[in-house]
Amino acid sequence: MPDAKDVILKHIAAVNDRDSDADPWAADAEIVAPGGRASGRDDVIGFLSVFHEAFPDLRLEIKQLLSDGPGAAAEGTLTGTHDGVLHTPNGDVAPTGRAVVLRWAAVYVTDGDTLKSEHLFFDQMDFLGQLGLLPG
């Protein structure tokens, strides 16, 4: 049985390569993140594609990855340039051209070689500030 770390590393590589076919999400996967959630493989991939559209050069880097059985936790950075439209629950944000470096953490549950769930955490205020969307 694959180690949870291997599944997470495959997921991160698929995100960085923009290869949704290689992303190991399970058919009944779930993602929960600031500002939204999605259930089911297709909806999860659609949820993540919002970030690819907004940040065409998006890259995820893991700084630390821990696992125990089917569970894993990671911390890392997201880098990218806001050169595309960012679709949010409150409306679309036009490209700002700003580069962001966003710290994130996630808790994962795997099942064999698939990713069942991700609970993603990041500082929304930091994110909005880097995009120049806060008064100030």
Enumerate the predicted regions with their spans:
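C-terminal and inter-domain tail/linker signature
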Residues: M1-G136
